[in-house]
Amino acid sequence: DKPHYSLRNTDISQLIQSALSNDMTIGLHSSYQAGIAPTLIKKEKTWLEKNVERSIRFNRHHFLASREPEDMTHLEADGITDDFTMGYADVAGFRLGTSYPVRWINPVTRRLSSILLHPLTIMDCTLEEKKYMGLNYEEALAYSLNLIEQVKNTGGELTLLWHNTSAQENTDSYLRKLYSHLLNELAKK
């Protein structure tokens, strides 16, 4: 599960520099292989830190795949403080039952971890793909706005996951249009 791009690519390099110069946070998107062999997390994190010249504290597992407790214990040992994996691929909403970050509890040791789990509220493909919710544009917009309103009413944290391929023009997908609509709505709030 290798990236489809190189960090040395001019466009990617400019994107990283723009993110860093605008004080944006860069996190690790740990690989599918790291989900199978959590010892790879440290190697991937170290590689990313070397390339962006910043300490990496945030993570999201590829395919929202997380094997507890192995993944979390490795994340914690490797200096990750926040994980954004906690969501279901097949339904948007509140997997943790809340829109607030919570600390992970190791089920083996029953120890309260230093890692904060941030609930993933909405993932692009969850809304559109037939194998998941399979919503049309109007349904996806209404569903998303309802979730956003719930987060606003509780003072929680909204986490959106939009893949770069969903932002492409000239596709049959409504996801680019939906993303733009949601960002405009959020800017009003």
Task: Please give the residue ranges for each predicted region.
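A general structural detector for well-ordered alpha-helical segments in enzyme core domains, enriched
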Residues: 11-15, 40-48, 71, 143, ...
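Short acidic (Asp/Glu) and glycine-rich catalytic loops that position anionic groups and cofactors
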Residues: 24-25, 123-128, 161
